[in-house]
Amino acid sequence: MLKTISPLISPTLLKVLAEMGHGDEIIFSDAHFPAQSLGPQVIRADGLSVSDLLRAIIPLFELDNYAPPLVMMAAVEGDTLDPAVEARYRDALSLEAPCPDIVRIDRYAFYERAQKAFAIVITGECAKYGNILLKKGVTP
């Protein structure tokens, strides 16, 4: 056990967060995301919500200052977003510093970013459009 590391962060996730360099991206996905078929390393975090994991990792993770560090999937035409999902994520990400803007991109553009991500963390999140991409920055 390590002191001050949340027990929600598995050893595998902790290793991945440490191995990521600035500019690398990680996705925290909902339970329905097609992570296995997209290619990068997949980490299971079944039973945990995305917001709980964000709250756990943000004290350890510097967000990028040079490019938009937060990306979520936009709703497909004719569908709607639940604003409470983004609000929960913003709340979790605001623990260390003000939360940067979240950029929304279409579903297929998000999948393309996911293919290039350092890792995808599949959670137990059931919220529709509950996926978020974080771009790692340089530690001060």
Swiss-Prot record:
Q: Which reaction does it catalyse?
A: alpha-L-fucose = beta-L-fucose
Origin: domain of life? Bacteria
Localisation per UniProt entry: Cytoplasm
> What's any one GO cellular component for it?
cytoplasm
Tell me its EC number(s), please: 5.1.3.29
Name the predominant localization.
Answer: cytoplasm
Residues passing through the membrane, by range: none
The active site of this protein is located at 22
Which molecular-function annotations from GO does this UniProt entry contain? fucose binding; L-fucose mutarotase activity
Q: Where does substrate bind?
A: 30, 107, 129-131
Pathway(s) per entry: Carbohydrate metabolism; L-fucose metabolism
The alphabetized UniProt keywords are: Carbohydrate metabolism, Cytoplasm, Fucose metabolism, Isomerase
The record, for Pfam families, names: RbsD_FucU
GO BP terms, alphabetized:
fucosylation; L-fucose metabolic process
Instruction: Report the function annotation for this chain.
Output: Involved in the anomeric conversion of L-fucose.
- Recorded family membership: Belongs to the RbsD / FucU family. FucU mutarotase subfamily.
Q: How does it assemble?
A: Homodecamer.
Its name, as the record gives it, is: L-fucose mutarotase
What is the species listed in this Swiss-Prot or TrEMBL entry? Salmonella arizonae (strain ATCC BAA-731 / CDC346-86 / RSK2980)
